């Protein structure tokens, strides 16, 4: 699953309800309190206590490292955590919340998918995009769907590298969030 889906989850959530979108810049003094407070709000509104994960922008890792000493929260770094069958290494645990650090370029409120016709293609931050500092969601909330499209098979005549066949395929990915699960999503967005 792509972390670019963070923008899709944020956009969907912000269009329907803004109660779990906190506008704050994460610093050493407020990082732990902001994320813990948002998690508590999401847990209360969704009425589910376990199964959450936080995606945190990597540029805020230092704020959590510096704040780890002066808090009553249990913070540990370098854990291996299994989330939906995938094991992630070097995960920070904030109390019982696994926090996966992801590149800032993937944590934007608006993204633009470039077609590749008149530009280089790929995914870039959209116009007026804000940084998402943290995205909290229940592991069962976003439903990722993959579709195999445009299968091409190359025989020995086209494949000059060796005497055999080669297959090329294009995968399409999408993300769905059921309306009844929106209460289990929260975000901290840069002001």
What is the predicted role of each segment?
Residues 9, 13, 61, 91, ...:
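Generic secondary-structure boundary/loop-capping signal
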Residues 1-24, 46-56, 156-177:
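Long, contiguous amphipathic alpha-helices that act as assembly "spine/axial" helices in icosahedral shell
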């Amino acid at each position: 699953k792509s972390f670019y889906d963070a923008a899709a989850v944020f956009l969907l959530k912000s269009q329907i309800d803004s109660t779990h979108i906190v506008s704050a810049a994460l610093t050493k003094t407020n990082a732990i309190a902001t994320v813990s407070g948002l998690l508590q709000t999401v847990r209360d509104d969704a009425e589910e206590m376990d199964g959450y994960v936080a995606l945190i922008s990597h540029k805020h890792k230092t704020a959590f490292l510096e704040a780890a000493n002066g808090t009553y929260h249990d913070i540990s770094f370098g854990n291996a955590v299994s989330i939906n069958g995938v094991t992630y290494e070097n995960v920070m645990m904030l109390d019982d919340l696994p926090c996966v650090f992801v590149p800032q370029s993937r944590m934007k409120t608006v993204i633009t998918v470039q077609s590749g016709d008149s530009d280089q293609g790929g995914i870039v931050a959209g116009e007026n995009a804000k940084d998402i500092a943290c995205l909290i969601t229940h592991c069962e909330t976003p439903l990722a769907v993959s579709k195999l499209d445009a299968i091409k098979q190359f025989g020995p005549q086209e494949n000059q590298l060796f005497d055999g066949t080669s297959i090329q395929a294009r995968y399409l990915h999408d993300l769905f969030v059921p309306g009844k699960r929106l209460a289990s999503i929260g975000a901290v967005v840069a002001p």
